[in-house]
């Protein structure tokens, strides 16, 4: 009895893995055994960096808020403390956006926080 290959499924599996390696250089993009390792590692980096991105953006927002706060004569920590005491609930993402786009509104927030 002849060996059953199930070539359709095998080809689909290989094609799916090779498709994920599109744009990879050299053997990493066209040799299946190397591609498997490259794609696995790429997915590990992607998983890790989706989480790191959240930390990176939060630190970016804090830097922007701190820079704008110092232009208004206060510091980031004093501003956040003042906002908490005066029950001003604006998250860091929105606060950083206001600091960059609308300096007058940010100054008003700083004044309200320093009451």
UniProtKB/Swiss-Prot annotation:
GO terms for molecular function: rRNA binding; structural constituent of ribosome. GO terms for cellular component: ribonucleoprotein complex; ribosome. One of its GO terms (biological process) is ribosomal large subunit assembly. Belongs to the bacterial ribosomal protein bL20 family. Keywords: Ribonucleoprotein, Ribosomal protein, RNA-binding, rRNA-binding. Binds directly to 23S ribosomal RNA and is necessary for the in vitro assembly process of the 50S ribosomal subunit. It is not involved in the protein synthesizing functions of that subunit. PROSITE patterns: RIBOSOMAL_L20. PANTHER family: 39S RIBOSOMAL PROTEIN L20. This is Large ribosomal subunit protein bL20.
């Amino acid at each position: 009895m002849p060996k059953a290959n199930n070539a359709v499924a095998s080809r689909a599996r290989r094609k799916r893995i090779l498709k994920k390696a599109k744009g990879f250089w050299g053997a990493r993009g066209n040799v299946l055994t190397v591609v498997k390792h490259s794609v696995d590692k790429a997915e590990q980096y992607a998983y890790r960096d989706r989480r790191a991105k959240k930390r990176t953006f939060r630190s970016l927002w804090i830097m922007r808020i701190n820079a704008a706060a110092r232009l208004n004569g206060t510091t980031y920590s004093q501003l956040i403390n003042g906002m908490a005491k005066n029950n001003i609930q604006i998250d860091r993402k929105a606060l950083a956006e206001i600091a960059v786009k609308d300096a007058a509104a940010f100054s008003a927030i700083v004044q309200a926080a320093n009451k």
